[in-house]
Amino acid sequence: MAEENIIFVGKKPTMNYVLAVVTQFNNNANKIIIKARGKTISKAVDVAEITRHKFIPDAKYEEIRLDTETLQGERGSSNVSSIEITLSR
């Protein structure tokens, strides 16, 4: 899968990410991966649901992967949850 078919969800408004997903599907991508960590996990789920219900009804969940990543910081290591949602058409 090409790197351009991966959408990293962050601090921007939800609809920006929805637009990115819809644009990728309109550019003939068959699979899109939506990735998020920590507090943005709920936003990633919103992006997937808005995409499926309002813009691309024939999109299906192919895979949902949950994980815990260990990040090193100034105060030692911390565990951060992450999600990868794969949508296909």
Curated annotation (Swiss-Prot):
Pfam families: Alba (PF01918). GO terms for biological process: chromosome condensation. The modification N6-acetyllysine is found at K11. It is found in: Cytoplasm; Chromosome. GO terms for molecular function: double-stranded DNA binding; RNA binding. The keyword Ribonucleoprotein does not apply. InterPro entries: Alba-like_dom_sf, DNA/RNA-bd_Alba, DNA/RNA-bd_Alba-like. Keywords: Acetylation, Chromosome, Cytoplasm, DNA condensation, DNA-binding. Acetylated. Acetylation at Lys-11 decreases DNA-binding affinity. GO terms for cellular component: chromosome; cytoplasm. Its main location: cytoplasm. Binds double-stranded DNA tightly but without sequence specificity. Involved in DNA compaction. Belongs to the histone-like Alba family. This is DNA/RNA-binding protein Alba. It comes from Thermoplasma volcanium (strain ATCC 51530 / DSM 4299 / JCM 9571 / NBRC 15438 / GSS1).
